[in-house]
Amino acid sequence: MRRRNPAALKPPRFPILAFDERELRLALGSVFNLKWLVPGESLVSILWKFGCANALAADFLVQLIDPDIDPSVGVAPVREVVNLMRLRRLLRLPENVLHASLLDAAVPGRYHPAFRYCRQCAAHGYHSVLYQLNDEDRCPAHRQSLETRCLHCGEETPYIVNASLVEAPFRCVSCHSHFSYGRLSLLSTTPAMRRRDRAAISHRLRVRSDDNMDVPRPEQRPRSPADDLRAMRR
C-alpha cells in the first residue's frame, strides 16, 4: 500500500478568512435612492427604508451604525452621538440630509423620549424629526394630533435606534401592530405623499429653522427656468 507524503497533510500557511455575506453585498453596493425620502425625514424612518431595501437584519444594521454598541441597547438618534461620517458611508446620502434627520442634544428637554407619529404619514412610510419636538402637537400635512401610544396595546415605543425598533418598521415594538391604517410600502413615499402635503412639511421645517437652531433648513432644489417664469407671472 502506498504511503502518503506527510508534507501533504500539513495545514496551509495562509489563513482561511471568514467573511460576512451581508458585508460583502454592501461593499459591492447597497440599494437606496434619495428620491425615496421626504424633507425632514428622521434617521429612524431612513433606516427602515434602507434595511427593507437591502434585506438587512436589524441587529446587523445597528452594528453597522456603531460597532461598539449593543444592538439591543442601541444609540440615541442625536448629532452629538451618531458618527455622521460613518453613517454617510453606509447610507450614501448627502451630509445635509443626514444632519437634518438627527436631533440636537445641545437642546435638552425639547424632545419627546417616545416615538411620535402621524397615522397618515405612517401609512405613507414617513416619519419626521419634527414629530419628536415637544412643542409640535400636530402633523403639518394632515393636521392630525401626533400619537405616542399604540392604539392596540397602549404601549409607547422608545425613540432609540436599537434592534427592537429597527426590526419593526412603523409598528409597535411591544405588539407589532401597525401605527398606520394598514400595511404599507417602505420603498418610496414620493408617489403616496401628495405634493401639497410635502410642501406643508417643507414649510414647517423652514419656519422652525428660522425660529430655532434645532431643526436644519430643508435642502433647496436649484431654481429652474419654469420657476423664474412662474415668479414673473405673479
PLM ranges: what are they?
Residues 1-114, 119, 125-127, 192-194, ...:
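A structured, charge-rich N-terminal accessory region that forms the first stable segment of a protein
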Residues 101-115, 127-133, 140-146, 161-167:
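Short, flexible, mixed-charge glycine/proline-rich loop motifs
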Residues 120-121, 138-141, 152, 174:
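Short, cysteine/histidine-rich loop/knuckle motifs that typically chelate Zn2+
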Residues 121-123, 134, 155:
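Secondary-structure-rich domain cores
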Residues 147-234:
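Domain-exit/linker segments immediately C-terminal to small folded modules
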